Amino acid sequence: MSFASETKKELTNLEMKECCEKAELSALLRMNGSLSFSNRRLSIDIQTENAAIARRIYTLLKKGYDVTVELLVRKKMRLKKNNVYIVRLVEKSREILADLHIVRDDFSFIRNISQELIEKKCCKRSYLRGAFLAGGSVNNPETSSYHLEIFSLYKEHNDAICELMNGFDLNSKTLERRKGYITYLKEAEKITEFLNIIGAHNALLRFEDIRIVRDMRNSVNRLVNCETANLNKTIGAALRQIENIRYIDETVGLDILPDKLREIAQLRRDYQDVTLKELGEMVSGGKISKSGINHRLRKIDDIAEKLRAGETVAKK
């Protein structure tokens, strides 16, 4: 089961206040419902591939309106061939849609979210929970990027969801897709805040556990890469220094070098694996700092380059 499916399964087991049930059900019917007329009767089909969500919708309708509700199961014949669950409402459809602020008295659709549904903060959370159950998805935190989104067919409703989310300081953004619109989050901290808002506390803890391990692993990798780069740089510099010292020795001899440079050249040639700090501790006249050793080695490099260019180098 995917992380998103586990999150939704957890949400379908939450207990709610009566006002919150109405807010959640409104989002579920608005986003997953479709209307049909048969034998002069209006019916509502709410479709989902998640059995737990289908049971949730069925229970909320029965509890809230005491109506006859049918639960149908069909199998997709294409792609994954998953089961499709259809919750069918054939009684009081018009009244229920009006009560959930999905249609007006003249049966025109309400595209945004009615303020009467979300007057209380708990109801705001419940509407977002219903919206996530109906059209939401969240990446597994182990994947390369963090992403949570809620899909809506209508721009007005999508903008209303974005505004509702940002009322909780989530910094959500909207984007038009080929068949609708999404409100999305990209920041891990904001995704965990959203999971907390809608009541997915177990999913939140799992998300955070995985994120902490992942971030720690990334930090270790960055540190290792940095140390490896520094080590490669150090090795490269040491090899260059040794090559230059050999070139000077074979071309004009190390005796051409000033005493201080000759001593460092001989030490670097004889102790190729030691660090600059260790070289500084080997100098006969007393300990020299890394920067001091590095300065002398750069002078040796300069002399080697002059010799390669055909210049005459005299001992100073």
From Swiss-Prot:
BP term (GO), one: cell division
Transmembrane segments: none
Residue ranges: DNA binding: 275-309
Keywords: Cell cycle, Cell division, DNA-binding
Family listed: Belongs to the WhiA family.
Role according to the record: Involved in cell division and chromosome segregation.
Gene3D superfamilies referenced in this protein's UniProt entry, alphabetically: Homing endonucleases (3.10.28.10)
Gene Ontology molecular function: DNA binding
Coiled coil (UniProt feature): none
Pfam families xrefs: HTH_WhiA, LAGLIDADG_WhiA, WhiA_N
Name of the protein in its database record: Probable cell division protein WhiA
